[in-house]
Curated annotation (Swiss-Prot):
Residues 175-196, 223-246 bind DNA. This is Uncharacterized HTH-type transcriptional regulator SACOL0084. The keyword Repeat applies. Residues 158-256 form the HTH araC/xylS-type domain. It comes from the Bacteria. The keyword DNA-binding applies. SUPFAM superfamilies: (Trans)glycosidases, Glycosyl hydrolase domain, Homeodomain-like, Regulatory protein AraC. It comes from Staphylococcus aureus (strain COL). GO terms for molecular function: DNA-binding transcription factor activity; sequence-specific DNA binding. Keywords: DNA-binding, Repeat, Transcription, Transcription regulation. Gene3D superfamilies: Glycosidases, Glycosyl hydrolase domain, family 39, Homeodomain-like.
Length: 745
């Protein structure tokens, strides 16, 4: 039976060049080796990897005590695994990162060690490692593509050679091959001899004999079987041809070589199996994934281009419900964490005027000499002032006289409280318009000239256009809501609905921009309550990972919207919702026990982008400068969130993105690679695994919060011109890569 691949350890040099009719990858186990090709010599030291491609001339020159190992793949085996073997021309370059070199060497060391050990499961383990090696080469080693459709006449001889290597075991003729390349028989024969120095039939028989030698050496099959499976019509024909090329009969050739069993062929010369295994162990590391589960590959070439576009960062507005919630030390800590990680500086609180009216109308009278009805409010204001937060307060049902009077008392007190300190940035937000707002805003502006007025904008606002025009000089922002879940019926599986829902937020934004333009209203927008597709239950909201979808929306909105709103945490959010559907109108940053939700990390990663855009497309944006830049890649797939609950219908897909950043200045660069996806940073799965009917204890809480973070990889790389990155993208995942060149020494 023809062997699919060979696994060898070599301690002796080759005396002559040989043309490889297969694909070879190996590394130096010990010492030093010189690898020669037609034009160059490459010096390889211990641990260095080498690759010799199909049809290349090569020679090994091992220095004293040098040992190399290699895996040699037969082209017929590769042709069974790949649609186009012409794509399997590999180049080890600066673009092959140290991490990927380590992983290739790791797999090969395991493979050779397994081959030498030859235990009960060696063959099965070998086959798994061989597939792993090929997958890793395909994904992480740069390749050159040669399409059969674009081969020029000068390359047609090579095309014939490749065809022979894949089909040598079949009945081949000069007539068949000339038709294959579109030449006449005489022209092909002439070109073949000119290019290779031998005729077509000589080359065909040489190829068959080389493969037959392997079978004679490594199998115990009969000579007749070997003859037939290598393209000879009979054992007699095989024997004549074999003796012509080797000056031996097949039987003599086999007899001159000792019987080499599967576990012995790698342990020749001065090294015993145990010594080789000990040497190989130095290169074996822990492997995270045994088989790469890549379903699709994508190739992206990026060259930085000057652009007039800028990326705008958002002002983040955090909803906390009642103002008194700011007295909670856990909530204070969460706000400060947000402020540190992505510059949160504005808090939105519910209307405090009804609370003040209740105190003012209490059956007993507060004595101003011994008490302060604003005591708890003052503590909240002090926290905001101490940490440079601005306060936006939602005014609700403000059309009564009692309300207006209480409002003025409150505003006057706040002005007095902050007068001896730095100014408080104070804003008012209304969702409905009433003429009493004019009196209130005049009083407010007299005490807080830098204060802002936020007006909720929707179709109903048009009915109050005259009042809106009167208030326009005081308006700082228009506020709106947009929830993609409102656009679909989750009981249906209509893809068109989900496609429409994916555009719902940006479509509503554009509608409001157009409405403002029609009525000559020019103010920045704030998207306060919003959500992407999540389904209409708490479970789908957690299971449906959508980091990439959120990033997609943020990028689309960055040039149209100035502010983005979030609820601070789950408990505050859910306590102000009527039902699950109402809960889906907004997004919170924290879950319980200070667990950070993926949207928190999405905001954090987005904040790492800078304003200068170097490159952008539908799934990638690069910002910064050519020596200090940020690459953001994301996947955004909109589908019914209920499918995320169906284990039988796995909506998780994996794509390998081969990314090249070209024309970089030569030097040493630092790479920081953040990965946020369902396997790295998703809180919900870990939460459910560690949650019991009695909740979670401290150990579980600490563990879940510690593990629910994006993955971070940091390394240095020496770049001469091109930065090559291999990125494993899971459905709706996000990758942020920060690249910074070190100063020249």
């Amino acid at each position: 039976m023809q062997r699919d691949y060979l696994i060898r350890v070599e301690t002796e040099s080759m005396s002559d060049f040989k043309r490889l009719n297969s694909l070879m990858i190996g590394f130096v186990i010990k010492g030093e080796a010189h690898i020669y090709d037609e034009n160059n010599m490459t010096q390889c030291n211990s641990g260095d990897i080498f690759i010799i491609n199909h049809r290349d001339l090569y020679r090994f020159q091992l220095q004293q005590d040098g040992i190399i190992c290699y895996i040699q793949f037969q082209m017929k085996y590769l042709a069974d695994k790949f649609d186009d073997v012409h794509c399997l021309y590999f180049h080890l370059t600066d673009a092959t990162t140290t991490k990927n070199i380590h992983q290739l060497r790791n797999i090969m060391a395991r493979l050779v060690s397994t081959h030498i050990r030859h235990n009960e499961l060696s063959k099965l383990t070998e086959q798994q490692l061989v597939i792993q090696l090929l997958m890793h080469m395909i994904h992480y080693v740069p390749r050159t593509y040669h399409s059969n459709q674009s081969i020029l006449n000068d390359d047609k001889v090579n095309q014939v050679c490749d065809y022979i290597e894949l089909h040598f075991h079949e009945d081949l003729s000069l007539s068949e091959l000339s038709e294959y390349v579109g030449w006449s028989e005489s022209h092909l024969s002439k070109k073949f001899t000119e290019s290779l120095g031998v005729g077509f039939h000589h080359f065909l028989n040489t190829t068959r004999i080389e493969h037959a030698k392997l079978d004679l050496t490594y199998t115990d099959e009969t000579i007749t079987d070997i003859a037939l499976q290598n393209g000879f019509s009979s054992a007699a024909s095989f024997a004549r041809t074999f003796k012509h090329f080797t000056h031996q009969t097949p039987k003599q050739y086999r007899g001159d070589r000792p019987a080499i069993t599967e576990n012995q062929q790698s342990a020749q010369h001065d090294y015993h199996d145990r010594e080789l295994i000990l040497l190989l162990n130095d290169y074996i590391e822990e492997m995270n994934h045994f088989i790469e589960d890549i379903e699709k590959m994508n190739y992206k070439e990026i060259a930085f281009q000057p652009t007039n576009h800028q990326l705008n960062q958002f002002n983040h507005i955090i909803q906390v419900g009642y103002l008194r919630n700011l007295l909670n030390t856990q909530y204070q800590s969460q706000l400060l964490t947000c402020h540190h990680d992505f510059q949160v500086n504005e808090v939105l609180a519910y209307d405090v005027i009804p609370y003040i009216m209740k105190k003012l109308n209490a059956p007993f009278t507060y004595d101003a000499e011994i008490s302060n009805i604003f005591y708890d409010i003052d503590l909240c204001l002090d926290f905001l002032l101490d940490h440079n937060f601005s306060l936006t307060m939602h005014l609700d049902q403000y059309d009564s006289r009692d309300y207006i009077d209480a409002f003025k008392i409150f505003i006057h007190h706040v002005a007095l409280h902050v007068s001896h300190r730095k100014d408080l940035k104070f804003n008012l937000y209304v969702t409905t318009l009433h003429t009493s707002l004019i009196e209130m805003i005049d009083y407010f502006k007299a005490l807080f000239p830098n204060g802002g007025l936020y007006i909720h904008l929707d179709q109903a606002t048009e009915r109050h256009l005259p009042l809106l025009k009167r208030l326009e000089p005081h308006i700082d922002h228009f506020v709106f809501d947009a929830n993609s879940n409102d656009a679909v019926d989750f009981n249906k599986m209509n893809d068109d609905e989900f496609k429409t829902a994916s555009q719902m937020i940006i479509n509503k934004t554009n509608y409001l921009i157009d409405l403002m333009h029609r009525h000559r209203l020019k103010r920045p927008l704030i998207l306060l309550n919003w959500n992407t597709l999540t389904g209409d239950t708490f479970i789908t909201n957690g299971e449906y990972f959508r980091g990439g979808i959120i990033i997609e929306q943020l990028l689309k909105l960055s040039s149209k919207v100035e502010g983005i709103g979030y609820w601070l945490n789950y408990d505050l959010h859910v306590s102000h919702c009527k039902n699950e559907r109402d809960y889906m109108n907004s997004i919170e940053l924290f879950h319980q026990y200070n667990g950070k939700r993926p949207v928190y990390f999405t905001a954090l990663l987005f904040n790492k982008l800078t304003s200068n855009i170097l490159y952008s497309d539908d799934t990638c944006i690069v910002t910064g400068t050519d020596s200090n830049f940020q690459i953001l890649l994301y996947d955004a797939k909109h589908f019914n969130p209920y499918l995320a609950l169906d284990n039988q219908m796995n909506m998780r897909a994996t794509e390998m993105i081969h990314l090249n950043i070209n024309a970089l200045e030569e030097g040493m660069y630092k790479i920081k690679h953040f990965t946020l996806d369902k396997e790295n940073g998703a809180l919900f799965n870990l939460w459910r695994k560690h949650h019991t009917i009695h909740g979670m204890d401290k150990d579980s809480i600490d563990y879940v919060n510690r593990m629910s973070f994006p993955k971070l990889e940091v390394y240095d790389i020496d770049i001469t011109d091109t930065l090559a990155l291999n990125i494993k993208m899971i459905t709706n995942g996000i990758h942020l890569i920060e690249v910074k060149r070190y100063p020249s020494s």
